[in-house]
Amino acid sequence: MRFKPFLAVVWLLLLTQQASSAIAQPTVNSIVPRSCMPGATTRVTITGKGFADPIRVATNRIDAKLDVVAVEAEKVTMDVTLPDSVPLGPFGIWLASAAGPSEPIIVMADDLPPVSEAAGNVAIESAQAVSTLVSVDGSSKGPQGSFFKIDVVENQRVAFEVVTQAIESKMDPVVRLMDADGNILVLADDDEIGPDCRFSYQFDTPGTYWIEVRDNRYTAGLAYQFRIGDFPILRHAFPLAVTAGEKTSIGFGGVDQTQAIVQEIEFPKSFANKVTTVATRI
């Protein structure tokens, strides 16, 4: 069921490709923002090449609504509307012209408000001020780091996560959390399940703190999603497979497994042999 819209686009393209071979297929360079909130419409801008009008869009998230607002040669503007009940996590969007489809564009359904990374945030002195509830669309800067700063109250717990694998980025992130004196409170690198960084910190002292995000191999231009919030730090869900049409309790393993709320889910029988995500909170 979830792939029917895309297959219909491919079928149409196969019928028309021979007559349109001189037109380049769409190629995507960037998407801003890279995350969309449930229960809202997000205006998304995609840049690249070969965006000939008319252009079609498709997604593997069957409950998402995509509306093309404007098409230019190197930019497509669209509105992405997600229902309140959408599962949090990555999903794909495809653009298709008469010449063929683009590679999939990975977008995150995220309940944290999206913010774009500011230009020039390459030092503590020029760090970008962000909220403790935010999802930042970022890009690695080679030998330089991206610096952010947050203000916290006494005994506030804040969770941090740099997402790369889910958005199919090749970045290998390293994160440093620092206090006003430059002391490193946390140095986060790979965890047990991959290169993404996830940790939480309980701030005993109120004030301003700084976070640096950089690529471990000093490569520039690699995408990442920097999430700051009050979410649990988890590694996996269990069981990993459920029976469609039956209610199942989903538990979680990881640092905050004892605090994470067990989720009861039931997928329709038509959802058999599909993959999805399950979100939880403390």
Residue ranges of model-derived segments:
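Generic detector of N-terminal low-structure segments
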Residues: P5-A8, V162
